[in-house]
Structures are given as structure tokens and as C-alpha cells.
A protein has these predicted regions:
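Right-hand nucleic-acid polymerase module
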Residues: 188-249
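Conserved polymerase palm-domain catalytic core
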Residues: 1-154, 338
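A conserved non-catalytic segment of reverse transcriptases
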Residues: 51, 60, 136-202, 206-211
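A glycine-rich phosphate-binding loop feature that marks nucleotide/adenosyl-phosphate handling sites
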Residues: 104-108, 144-154, 203-207, 224-232, ...
């Protein structure tokens, strides 16, 4: 979605006005009758999904409308329900491309934006069409949260802020997303004031790593450094509070280590169950590389053998981005004695090469080293 936003808004001739769509209670209000009548799937299974309800505190709550709260199938059903929005806009405004209306839709599940050449056109023509489309499905746009914004003022979408600065489009983590992330970390640290350092690191790392990976395709390096500083301040207060009678120097040496050029790494050594000493180190968001996302082709199907070569190429490029991926490719290279599996010539950094699966993923293969070759 971020790559699509960049594609439709980054050029000088791109639309300057954006309709930010917000569906009021999307998952709660989708019409069961509409889904049963229109979704192309087994109706018996669909009815069971819709009527499954949910269990909270050992009590069953039936689902009379919408999709089951928290169910893994709910986003899929919502996505299928909204799947015709782009087609509807293309039919309703079939001449938009030739008349300079600059109509584009970017949608991810129930979050979407629609671009246009003017605020009035989006308000008076596009918005009513969207309202009509949603009404058929039992949905309505939120009057308060649905708004039309100029790209120069920017807008928030999926946790990012999209805005043009002097004609240059930048996509950054939004202030609201950063604040929510720090609030979550702060609450976790405050709830574990007496927890062992290794345990706290184990609780924080998945959150830090997941958030940083989510924003690793946008302009986020400066934000990553700011988040690292904020997390350091939280952990410093956590450490000082635990030892009110110790000096600050003692606290620093107890909880923060020197690693390379970094002198304040939240880290510790602990003995694991097998008797071996293991080092636990807090993840730094700033260590996450910023890599531009390569959009997948719309028609690509990972289950179709005809697309195997395309997905092999994408997979190989992703492997080169991470240290774990490069290490796996290195093990494959060593397994083959540093030579190509086909021509047996040496594979070096100066020779063109690519990786592939011996048993294709579409045929049940895995990403294990034993199933890879260069």
C-alpha cells in the first residue's frame, strides 16, 4: 500500500487532493445477507463462519451482524466484501483517465484513499458513489473521520504520514503510530519493574523488531533513532529505580554494555537451562535497514507453477537484505563447494547468479538449506 501511494502521488502531475475513507465499524456491520448472496464461496461454510460468534470470559456471544470479532477469517471476508470498489469507480468514472480527473484508489482491507484533481469533485461526485457502494453492503462512511485533504498538508494512512514537502513526496511513520508504540513499550516496562533483565529483553524485542520491520520500507531512519533514544530513557529509569542506593556508574555497568562503538547497549549474560552462558541484547530500531519495497505483480499467483521463476527472483532479493538470509545463502554456497549447480563454474561476487528451490514451493518445497541451490 505504501508503494502504491508513492506511485500515484509522487509525480509532479499527480493528484493533489485525497479522500481519506474511514468505514464506521466495518467488521461489526457488514451485511450477512449481502455476503451470502454475493461472495463466491461455499454458502454452508460461509454461514457457519458468520454465525460462529466469539467466546469472552467463558461466555459465548453470538454474531448477529458483521464478521466474528478477532477471528482470523474476518479480515478476509471484509476484504472480499470491499473487493468491487475499484471496479465500481472505474465504471462510474470511465472517462476519468482521459479528462484529467486523476482518479486512483489505494486500499488495504477496510482502509482506503481515493485521489482526485479537485476537492469539489471528490466531495460531490466520488464520495456519493462510495457511500452508495457501501450502503449495499450495510456499511457507512464515518462523518467525522472521512475527510478530503491536500497532499501538501499530508494525511495518515496505515500508520504512516504521507505528505509532499516542496514537491517531494515523503512517507514516514505517523506521530500517532509512534506515540502508540512508545506508550505500549512504556506500559510493558512499568508492568515489569521487578522482572529480570533477560526476561524484559525477551518481552521487548518482538515488539521493537516487529514495529521497525513494518516501517523499514519508508523514510524512517530519523524516527528509528528517536525511538531508540526514548526507549533508552525508559530503561535507564527502570534500572535506576531498582537500585536506589547504588551509584549511577554502578547501574550503568550493571545493565548497559559496550558493543563496538556503542557504549550504552541494554544487555546481559545469563546461564541457560543447558548450562551455557547466553547473551541477551535489546534490539535497536536504528539497526533495521531501510529497503524500498518492490511491489508484487497483481496477477502473480504463488500456487501457479507458471509464476515459479518470478517468485524465486523476489525471494532471492529478499534473502540478500537480511543477515539471516545472507547466512543461509552462504551455507548453500559452501554446500556446493562454491560452484554453480548447473555448469559447475565458480560462483563469486563478480559472476551473475541466482538462487532457486530444488522442489518448488508450489509443489510443497521449503526454504530449508537442503532444498536450495545456486
Amino acid at each position: 500500500a505504501a508503494a502504491q501511494c508513492f506511485g500515484v502521488l509522487s509525480r509532479k502531475v499527480s493528484a493533489e487532493w485525497v479522500l481519506e475513507g474511514d468505514i464506521q465499524g466495518c467488521f461489526d456491520n457488514i451485511s450477512h445477507d449481502w455476503m451470502i448472496a454475493n461472495l463466491p464461496m461455499d454458502k454452508v461454510i460461509l454461514r457457519k463462519w458468520l454465525k460462529a460468534g466469539y467466546v469472552y470470559q467463558s461466555k459465548l456471544f453470538p454474531s448477529l451482524s458483521g464478521t466474528p470479532q478477532g477471528g482470523i477469517i474476518s479480515p478476509v471476508l471484509a476484504n472480499m466484501t470491499l473487493d468491487g470498489l475499484e471496479t465500481m469507480l472505474a465504471k462510474r468514472f470511465s472517462n476519468a483517465k482521459w479528462t484529467g480527473k486523476k482518479l486512483q484508489l489505494v486500499r488495504y482491507a477496510d482502509d482506503f484513499i481515493i485521489t482526485g484533481y479537485s476537492k469539489e469533485w471528490l466531495e460531490n461526485e466520488v464520495r456519493p458513489a462510495v457511500v452508495e457502494f457501501l450502503a449495499q453492503r450495510g456499511l457507512v462512511l464515518s462523518q467525522e473521520k472521512t475527510k478530503i485533504t491536500h497532499i501538501g498538508n499530508g494525511f495518515d494512512f496505515l500508520g504512516w504520514n504521507v505528505r509532499k514537502y516542496n514537491g517531494k513526496l515523503l512517507i514516514k511513520p505517523s506521530k500517532a503510530n509512534i506515540s502508540a508504540h512508545l506508550d505500549k513499550l512504556r506500559a510493558l516496562i512499568n508492568a515489569n519493574k521487578a522482572t529480570r533483565q533477560a526476561t524484559l529483553i525477551g518481552l521487548l524485542n518482538p515488539i521493537l523488531r516487529g514495529w521497525a520491520n513494518y516501517h523499514s520500507h519508508v523514510v524512517a531512519k530519523k524516527v528509528f533513532n528517536q525511538v531508540d533514544n526514548a526507549v533508552w530513557e525508559m530503561l535507564w529509569r527502570w534500572a535506576v529505580r531498582r537500585h536506589p542506593r547504588k551509584t549511577l556508574r554502578w547501574v550503568k555497568d550493571r545493565y548497559f554494555k559496550v558493543q563496538g562503538a556503542r557504549r550504552w547497549v541494554f544487555s546481559c549474560d545469563e546461564q541457560s537451562a543447558d548450562g551455557r552462558k547466553r547473551q541477551y541484547t535489546l534490539v535497536s530500531a536504528s539497526d533495521t535497514p531501510i529497503v524500498r519495497h518492490i511491489k508484487i505483480k497483481a496477477a502473480a499467483n504463488p500456487h501457479d507453477p507458471a509464476w515459479d521463476e518470478y517468485f524465486e527472483s523476489r525471494w532471492g532479493k529478499r534473502m540478500l537484505v537480511s543477515a539471516k538470509g545472507r547466512a543461509k545463502l552462504y551455507r548453500v554456497w559452501l554446500k556446493q563447494g562454491g560452484r554453480c549447480c548447473a555448469c559447475l563454474k565458480p560462483v563469486t561476487k563478480d559472476t551473475p547468479w541466482h538462487s532457486r528451490h530444488i522442489v518448488k514451493l508450489s509443489h510443497g518445497g521449503t526454504d530449508a538449506v537442503a532444498n536450495l541451490e545456486i
